């Protein structure tokens, strides 16, 4: 009887390698979440993208859309992006700011973005908290707060690396905008305690870092941009200020409160675009609210002058009214994004369950029921800075009034970190125009504050090249 010769050693090793490779693929990116064909594109992308759900805390399911880097995804950093609100969708960031494709006014077509942040990074867009966009909770309970959202986002991030283990060793950056000024540092404090995540830094654009500094600075911003007359300014100085210090935040003087109500009206409800002072207001001068069929449309996200009594009374009255209410960001046209994301073919491509309600840019109930536990992010940033491990960037478009540059600059100054680079212009090369001043930057030990000249609240929308240049220098630890 002739016995078969044992297989050569190299064949056994090859088989073992194939088995290991197969096993690792089984634990890698979830095939069921991969977007096979995205409607609206003339040509499908060469990079891979995924849409599905990550497990938040409790019974929460947070929708994510993950776009791999167009340049070496295996070695590119992972960047989490969160929009704010509270209660607004991060798909706004993807489809109108810095995603690989931008939705067009027809609500059908997508065009590739030459300044997409996924040119150099793997970007994870997360709709948070539950109740926002396509995110949901099995118990349908959507009242939440800063601490719960941080924990839920943290658990979702852990779930992401479970689903995509091939990225667990990549550099991780946490980024966001607006109320992500609260979301990002509170999340970062949790992430820094998890050694399995390779956290490198965080960047927040036009963030709400301190309610007090945001309100106090906004009055100065409004006056010196010609929005308040001398009579109102003089009255504010008389009734809100003493001993060369003004309190426009929680002043109890009745005349001061009356004057601040007028400032709030001018800034937020007179027809000026609160997100970009020099941009038109989409749809024309708005009223405080409007009716669309049987729905009341509200446009105040509740982040400025929150201590004014009329602001709180107005929202509570709406909640008790029993009317159907929708929230839209002021002076912003959300029709294109809403039309696109409510297209049944798009929802199917994104693996969205059929039973979920329509997608809205912002969720009124999430916003109104949200409990704001922190009035300042001072302690969170000091904890992050004390580790001396992370690079932090706070950047602001300088014509935004929702979260103005002056308030965030005051906030960074108040952290009392060692100054390393004095305030100076930073430059961007604009084709044939050569290098131009893109804004100003000052750098402290492990934290920088930077402005983008002529940009509003959504910096990548208004100044895409400057935003991309800033983002690239931030990721690569290059001088701004």
Swiss-Prot record:
Residues annotated as signal peptide: 1-28
EC number(s) stated in the UniProt entry for this protein: 3.4.16.5
GO process annotations (BP): intracellular protein transport; negative regulation of chaperone-mediated autophagy; proteolysis; regulation of chaperone-mediated autophagy; regulation of protein stability
Cysteine disulfide partners in this protein: 88-362, 240-256, 241-246, 281-331
Chief location of this protein within or outside the cell: other
Known outcome of mutating residue 249 to N: In GSL; small amount of activity
Compartments it resides in: Lysosome
Xref: Pfam families: Peptidase_S10
An annotated Gene Ontology molecular function: enzyme activator activity
UniProt keywords, alphabetically: Carboxypeptidase, Disease variant, Disulfide bond, Glycoprotein, Hydrolase, Lysosome, Protease, Signal, Zymogen
Catalytic activity: Release of a C-terminal amino acid with broad specificity
Family annotation (SUPFAM superfamilies): alpha/beta-Hydrolases (SSF53474)
Top-level taxon: Eukaryota
Active site: 178, 400, 457
UniProt cross-references to InterPro entries, sorted A to Z: AB_hydrolase_fold, Peptidase_S10, Ser_caboxypep_his_AS, Ser_caboxypep_ser_AS
Any one GO cellular component localisation term in the record: intracellular membrane-bounded organelle
Stated consequence of mutating residue 395 to C: In GSL; loss of activity
Residues glycosylated per entry: 145, 333
Family: Belongs to the peptidase S10 family.
Classification via PANTHER family: LYSOSOMAL PROTECTIVE PROTEIN, SERINE PROTEASE FAMILY S10 SERINE CARBOXYPEPTIDASE
Subunit description: Heterodimer of a 32 kDa chain and a 20 kDa chain; disulfide-linked.
Its biological purpose: Protective protein appears to be essential for both the activity of beta-galactosidase and neuraminidase, it associates with these enzymes and exerts a protective function necessary for their stability and activity. This protein is also a carboxypeptidase and can deamidate tachykinins.
Pathology noted in the entry: Galactosialidosis: A lysosomal storage disease associated with a combined deficiency of beta-galactosidase and neuraminidase, secondary to a defect in cathepsin A. All patients have clinical manifestations typical of a lysosomal disorder, such as coarse facies, cherry red spots, vertebral changes, foam cells in the bone marrow, and vacuolated lymphocytes. Three phenotypic subtypes are recognized. The early infantile form is associated with fetal hydrops, edema, ascites, visceromegaly, skeletal dysplasia, and early death.
Protein name in UniProt: Lysosomal protective protein
Organism encoding this protein: Homo sapiens
């Amino acid at each position: 009887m002739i016995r078969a010769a044992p297989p050569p050693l190299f064949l056994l090793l090859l088989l073992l390698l194939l088995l290991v490779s197969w096993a690792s693929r089984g634990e890698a990116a979830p095939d069921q979440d991969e977007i096979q064909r995205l409607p609206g594109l003339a040509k499908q992308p060469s990079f891979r993208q995924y849409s599905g759900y990550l497990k938040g805390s409790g019974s929460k399911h947070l929708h994510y859309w993950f776009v791999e880097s167009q340049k070496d995804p295996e070695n590119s950093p992972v960047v989490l992006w969160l929009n704010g609100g509270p209660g607004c969708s991060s798909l706004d960031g993807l489809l109108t700011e810095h995603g690989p494709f931008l939705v067009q006014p027809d609500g059908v077509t997508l065009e590739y973005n030459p300044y997409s942040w996924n040119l150099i990074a793997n970007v994870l867009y997360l709709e948070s908290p539950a109740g926002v966009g396509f995110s949901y909770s099995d118990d349908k309970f959507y009242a939440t707060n800063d601490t719960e959202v941080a924990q839920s986002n943290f658990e979702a991030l852990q779930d992401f690396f479970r689903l995509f283990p091939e990225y667990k060793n990549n550099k991780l950056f946490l980024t966001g905008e607006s109320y992500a000024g609260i979301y990002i540092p509170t999340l970062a404090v949790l992430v820094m305690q998890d050694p399995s995540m390779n956290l490198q830094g965080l960047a927040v654009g036009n963030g709400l870092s301190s309610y007090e500094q945001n309100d106090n600075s906004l009055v100065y911003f409004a006056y010196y941009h010609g929005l308040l007359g001398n009579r109102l300014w003089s009255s504010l100085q008389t009734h809100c200020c003493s001993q060369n210090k003004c309190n426009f935040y929680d002043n109890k003087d009745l005349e001061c409160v009356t004057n601040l109500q007028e400032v709030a009206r001018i800034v937020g409800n007179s027809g000026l675009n609160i997100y970009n002072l020099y941009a038109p207001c989409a749809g024309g001068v708005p009223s405080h609210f409007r009716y669309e069929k049987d729905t009341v449309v509200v446009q105040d996200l509740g982040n400025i002058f929150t201590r004014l009594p009329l602001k709180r009374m107005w929202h509570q009255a709406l909640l008790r009214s029993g009317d159907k209410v929708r929230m839209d960001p002021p002076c912003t046209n959300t029709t294109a994004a809403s039309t696109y994301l409510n297209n049944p073919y798009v929802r199917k491509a994104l693996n969205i369950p059929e039973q979920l309600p329509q997608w809205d840019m912002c969720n009124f109930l999430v916003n109104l029921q949200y409990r704001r536990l922190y009035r300042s992010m001072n302690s969170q940033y000091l904890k992050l800075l004390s580790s001396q491990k992370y690079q932090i960037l706070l950047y602001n478009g300088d014509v935004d009034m929702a979260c103005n540059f002056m308030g965030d600059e005051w906030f960074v100054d108040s952290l009392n970190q060692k100054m390393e680079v004095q305030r100076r212009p930073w430059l961007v090369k604009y084709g044939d125009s050569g290098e131009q001043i893109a804004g100003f930057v000052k750098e402290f030990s492990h934290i920088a504050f930077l402005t983008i000249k002529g940009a509003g609240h959504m910096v990548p929308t208004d100044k895409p090249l400057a935003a991309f240049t800033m983002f690239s220098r931030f990721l690569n630890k290059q001088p701004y």
